[in-house]
């Protein structure tokens, strides 16, 4: 069953355990004028057999015109029907494009936890998934005019399908509505949103040669490249503890993309290496903290054990020191 309300798509997969398919796609749904679909890999995207994989994908990306790109924030949830507190969630803000039309997690939930008896994720052999999508920006035309979007509901039992989704990447993504042209502003030949103007101006003031060798002339491609640059810088401003290793791999890819486009970003490459080092130090420090906490826990337990032994010995000494009474002697 699929139900779309207020940018939230709810998908209930029936007869989940009987699936023989490598990938199970949801029906298409429209949010922000863009067509989407969910992809579930019951035994994992890489056929690992130990985790379920879940992705959000732009529906039928091959039908879209060259240069299309969509920026969106999404939240994917595998619902625990006994307690929402232990539902599994994946939230991210990403760019969807021809190269990467889908984002999500290859290790969304361990299969042992998913199939656990009375675990709450599979109830009556039904798996409930909720996708919330907020489209931030669209480069290229919308799939569907937003006024034509309607609430849809479809019953979808598990069935075997043959679909080639090998191009789906194991990450996450986001999207946005296309602003009217009048809302875009020009900064050094790049069309940006009003909210981005001051930041982009600061970039050009501090790095005036950044676009000296920039090659693309198409305004949509120029805008896409600038958005990749801004997204990369936004990532680098995140606290290390909030960045995953996948985020850093994605940042590396974004850096390569903007460099190939002609942006001079040597300074940004150094910052990325600095963030990587901070992340490594954070992970190493976190591991050391856990190790020390375990050692301290063991030490405290030993202290408690020693204190208990000490009290026992004191009790024995007191007993030994007690004099015999007259009754004991007689």
UniProtKB/Swiss-Prot annotation:
Q: Which residues form the MATH domain?
A: 6-133
Cross-referenced Gene3D superfamilies: Apoptosis, Tumor Necrosis Factor Receptor Associated Protein 2, Chain A
One Pfam family per UniProt: MATH_2
Q: Coiled-coil stretches, from where to where?
A: 263-314
Q: Which UniProt keywords apply?
A: Coiled coil
Indicate yes or no for the key word Transcription. Answer: no
Question: Looking at the keywords, is rRNA processing present?
Answer: no
User: What name appears for this protein in its UniProt entry?
Assistant: MATH domain and coiled-coil domain-containing protein At3g58210
Organism expressing this protein natively: Arabidopsis thaliana
């Amino acid at each position: 069953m699929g139900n779309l309300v207020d940018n939230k798509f709810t998908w209930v997969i029936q007869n989940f355990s009987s699936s023989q398919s490598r990938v199970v796609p949801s029906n298409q749904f429209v949010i922000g004028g863009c067509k989407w679909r969910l992809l579930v890999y019951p035994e994992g995207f890489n056929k690992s057999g130990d985790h379920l994989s879940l992705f959000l994908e732009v529906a039928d990306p091959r039908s879209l015109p060259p240069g299309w790109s969509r920026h969106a924030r999404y939240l994917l949830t595998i619902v625990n029907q006994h307690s929402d507190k232990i539902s599994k969630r994946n939230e991210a803000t990403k760019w969807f494009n021809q190269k990467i039309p889908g984002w999500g997690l290859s290790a969304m939930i361990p299969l042992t936890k998913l199939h656990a008896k009375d675990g709450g994720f599979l109830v009556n052999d039904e798996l409930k998934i909720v996708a919330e999508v907020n489209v931030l920006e669209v480069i290229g035309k919308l799939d569907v005019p937003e006024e034509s979007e309607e609430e849809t509901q479809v019953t979808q039992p598990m069935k075997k399908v043959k679909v080639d989704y090998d191009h789906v990447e194991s990450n996450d993504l986001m999207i946005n509505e296309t602003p009217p042209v009048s809302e875009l502003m020009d900064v050094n030949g790049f069309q940006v949103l009003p909210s981005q103007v001051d930041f982009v101006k600061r970039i050009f003031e501090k790095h005036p040669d950044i676009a000296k060798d920039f090659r693309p002339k198409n305004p949509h491609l120029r805008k896409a490249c600038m958005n990749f640059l801004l997204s990369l810088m936004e990532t680098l401003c995140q606290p290390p503890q909030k960045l995953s290793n996948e985020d850093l791999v994605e940042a590396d890819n974004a850096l390569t993309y903007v460099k190939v486009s002609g942006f001079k970003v040597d300074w940004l490459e150094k910052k990325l290496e600095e963030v990587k080092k901070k992340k490594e130090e954070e992970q190493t420090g976190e591991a050391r903290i856990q190790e020390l906490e375990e050692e301290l826990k063991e030490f405290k337990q030993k202290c408690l054990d020693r204190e208990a032994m000490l009290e026992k010995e004191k009790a024995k000494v007191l007993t030994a020191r007690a004099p015999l009474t007259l009754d004991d002697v007689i």
